[in-house]
A protein has these predicted regions:
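Amphipathic alpha-helical segments at domain termini/boundaries
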Residues: 72-162
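Well-ordered beta-strand positions
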Residues: 38-41, 59-63, 79, 110-113
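Hydrophobic alpha-helical segments that mediate membrane insertion or helix-helix packing
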Residues: 6, 54-55, 102
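Single conserved hydrophobic/aromatic residue that forms the stacking wall/gate
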Residues: 1-12
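Hydrophobic alpha-helical bundle architecture
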Residues: 42-46, 64, 87-93
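CoA-thioester-processing core
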Residues: 28, 50-52, 56, 63-83
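Short, well-ordered alpha-helix to beta-strand connector turns
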Residues: 8, 58-59, 99, 108
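Thiamine diphosphate
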Residues: 13-38, 44-52, 56-59
Length: 162
């Protein structure tokens, strides 16, 4: 049973490689790092795996209060470290996937508040909060020269995890 699960995980990774996902993510990061426009990223639900890495290049990274963001799922991390996805809660805790934790360690810049229970409880409030964040941060970022924005973006990318 364990052998088949590992084989299935290996096949999923191999299929991803066959489709060129890692190369596509790398190309995305290279292109986004040179875009001459402010980039604001808002994680509204689950930002995970290669998709999380692909959007990490923004000039400002915000997350909704109850969103999660990581380059691997807690199940994948637990499978790698403890060889069982059953340890996903421990992995999630160690990975710091929640917005408040990621803000503390400077992976993200801002936590956008949500109603108790999540964004689906009041779309109007959450939409207004996201709009306010976007307007505020676009105003701030538009004061930088393009050279300064590109320099800050590059520094942000190389400082992740440092």
């Amino acid at each position: 049973h364990l052998y088949h699960r590992r084989q299935r995980q290996m096949c999923i990774r191999d299929r991803g490689e066959q489709r060129g996902q890692s190369e596509a993510i790398a190309r995305n990061l290279a292109v986004m790092s040179e875009l001459k426009t402010p980039i604001i990223v808002v994680v509204t639900g689950e930002g995970g795996s290669g998709g999380a890495l692909a959007i990490s290049i923004g000039d400002h990274l915000s997350m909704l209060e109850y969103a999660t963001y990581s380059v691997a799922s807690p199940e994948a991390c637990a499978s790698i470290i403890w060889r069982t996805p059953d340890k996903a809660p421990e992995a999630a805790n160690a990975m710091k996937v929640c917005s408040s934790e990621l803000k503390k360690i400077n992976v993200i810049d801002e936590v956008i508040s949500e109603p108790v229970g999540g964004a689906h409880r009041d779309f109007d409030i959450v939409s207004a909060n996201i709009k306010a964040s976007l307007v505020n941060n676009l105003t701030i970022l538009s004061k930088y020269s393009m050279d300064d924005l590109l320099e800050r973006r590059y520094k942000r990318l190389i400082d992740i995890g440092a």
